Amino acid sequence: MRKVEFLDTTLRDGEQTPGVNFSIKEKVAIAKQLEKWGIASIEAGFPAASPDSFEAVRQISAAMTTTAVSGLARSVKSDIDACYEALKDAKYPQCHVFIATSPIHREYKLKKTKEEILDIIKEHVTYARSKFDVVEFSPEDATRTELDYLLQVVQTAVDAGATYINIPDTVGFTTPEEYGNIFKYLIENTKSDREIIFSPHCHDDLGMATANTLAAIKNGAGRVEGTVNGIGERAGNVALEEIAVALNIREDYYQATSDIVLNETVNTSELISRFSGISIPKNKAVVGGNAFSHESGIHQDGVLKNPLTYEIITPELVGVKHNSLPLGKLSGRHAFVEKLKELELAFEESEIATLFGKFKKLADKKHEITDADIRALVAGTEIENPEGFHFGDLKLTSNADDTVTAEVLMVNADGEEVEVIANGKGSVEAIYNAVDKFFNQTVRLLSYTMDAVTDGIDSQARVSVSIENVDTGTIFNASGIDFDVLKAGAIAYVNANAFVQKENAGEIGKAVSFRDVPTN
């Protein structure tokens, strides 16, 4: 049975999601988890975009041991050079070169003829091949490109040395039948004495990304591209976890397998959710909170008698673990550290004291500390802003005029404290007015969402916010976790404002867009 490779582009295409801004440290942590999950290749970024993008690709390259690392490049030699430099430490480097090919892009964006684009493809894939053993080529907006011309494009890239041919449904335009036929036609008609691997790259604008990707696999695709949780611009990308589980459950139909370690799926999904600040919808396939819930009495009865009556995916398959022995108030440091190892949570030795201190505070509030509590505790530590001032504490006072006064304590790494006071019509407004007063920058709150990350009345809460830097239009997401939902919201808002502060200070610069028209 053939095996389908998985390329993850969460760190490149997934970061196109409005408000998602992974730090370099977060990107490396994500890459390590993706490798553990069984991803064959990680598209780590677009090295030519900015110094931060270059450095992220460089650090990820050095950190990977079994997974290939790819960098994106426009059909521009300087982009390919940037990929080469950033990927020098990669054990298995790959370069992904692309150019748009559809009529609308040829006429309005590139202002190039068909023949000129073929010449550009030949020149730049050849150049990339001179620096990399493995080159991937993508004709952007392939599904709106004339099929006969698309074959010419693909053949030109293959003749120039491309090993992987990616067929992007850039705007989520195609249908499963159409997309499957495109793959069938290209695979049957592309000529080469080397093995050429075709891959789908689907966006979900019409809600068909998963179906389209599976149609491509059914028609011969040997690699799939997508993101964890389906994050990405507009309606997002295909969710790789859905493809991995579909291939496992319907192996009989697709006659294909993968190297994805399915019981790492939930851990991978939750990590992306924490770092992106995007909560996983309850009804999300495979990893949503309701994926293994049954409201109907008939369904519940059936599941109790035999889970296969209404569950085609078992919780254990994707890594939903039943809680082992819980910790408690009397649990010591050793037991706590062993629990972190048991749950395979990443931590540095220097972080143990801080984590254990938070655990003891948690134990004072909860009788039993579950695995979910421990994961939330570590997650809360990870998403705090370690640089500059961060949220310390707050005090609220209700006033006679029905307003609320918030006293917010901000603390920096050196232990310096600053207290800011502000009023508001309600608790959240008062807290956020105080934070605004502290940062003294113009932002607009776009969204505020809350969900419970553990079970029970004493559950920890996660608040996710999205704010806009009014001066630049840039959107930033951030999250906060605490027993007190107001404190969780304060943490999230402070973290989001810290991103804005960095952008205003020039630490987050304007990156070159991979959609900018090449100058050569």
UniProtKB/Swiss-Prot annotation:
It catalyses: 3-methyl-2-oxobutanoate + acetyl-CoA + H2O = (2S)-2-isopropylmalate + CoA + H(+). One of its GO terms (cellular component) is cytoplasm. InterPro entries: 2-IPM_HCS-like, 2-isopropylmalate_synth_dimer, AIPM/Hcit_synth_CS, Aldolase_TIM, LeuA/HCS_post-cat, LeuA_allosteric_dom_sf, LeuA_bact_synth, PYR_CT. Its cofactor is Mn(2+). The keyword Transferase applies. It is found in: Cytoplasm. One of its GO terms (molecular function) is acetyl-CoA C-acetyltransferase activity. Its EC number is 2.3.3.13. Mn(2+) binds at D13, H201, H203, N237. Residues 4-266 form the Pyruvate carboxyltransferase domain. Residues 390-520 are annotated as: Regulatory domain. It holds the Pfam family HMGL-like. Keywords: Amino-acid biosynthesis, Branched-chain amino acid biosynthesis, Cytoplasm, Leucine biosynthesis, Manganese, Metal-binding, Transferase. Its main location: cytoplasm. Belongs to the alpha-IPM synthase/homocitrate synthase family. LeuA type 1 subfamily. Homodimer. Catalyzes the condensation of the acetyl group of acetyl-CoA with 3-methyl-2-oxobutanoate (2-ketoisovalerate) to form 3-carboxy-3-hydroxy-4-methylpentanoate (2-isopropylmalate). This is 2-isopropylmalate synthase.
